[in-house]
Amino acid sequence: MAIGLNVTEPEGTCSDEDCPFHGNLSVRGQVLEGEVASTDMEKTVVVEREYDVFVPKYDRYMKRRSRVPAHAPECFDISVGDTVSIAETRPLSKTKSHVVVEITDGGDA
C-alpha cells in the first residue's frame, strides 16, 4: 500500500530511480492488466491487451489489441507470457508512461 494501490510489494530490492516501491516514482491514473509480449529492451516490457469492438455493419465483434510499453523495475523478474498490472505515471521517455506494479500470474516477484 506504499504507492497508493492495492498491490503486493515485490520481495526483491532494487536501486532503480524509476521504481514506484524503492525509488521516487509516483503513480496516478489508470491501472491496466495485460500479457507481456516482449522483453527485448533494457528495463522495458511491451504489454499487450486484447479487447472486442462491435462492428454494426456485420452485427459481430472484432478482436483488437493494444501494445503499451512499460517500465520494468529491477525488483521484478518478468518474462514473456506473464500477466502483469501496469500503472500510469509521468512520461519516462518518448513512448513510456506506464510502470509495472505487480505480476499477477506466471512469474515470481
From Swiss-Prot:
BP terms from Gene Ontology: translation
Pfam families attached to this UniProt entry: Ribosomal_S17
PROSITE patterns recorded: RIBOSOMAL_S17 (PS00056)
Molecular-function GO term, any one: structural constituent of ribosome
GO CC annotations, alphabetized: cytosolic small ribosomal subunit
Family: Belongs to the universal ribosomal protein uS17 family.
Function: One of the primary rRNA binding proteins, it binds specifically to the 5'-end of 16S ribosomal RNA.
Assembly and binders: Part of the 30S ribosomal subunit.
Name listed for the protein in its UniProt record: Small ribosomal subunit protein uS17
Organism: Halobacterium salinarum (strain ATCC 700922 / JCM 11081 / NRC-1)
Taxon lineage: Archaea, Methanobacteriati, Methanobacteriota, Stenosarchaea group, Halobacteria
Gene that encodes it: rps17
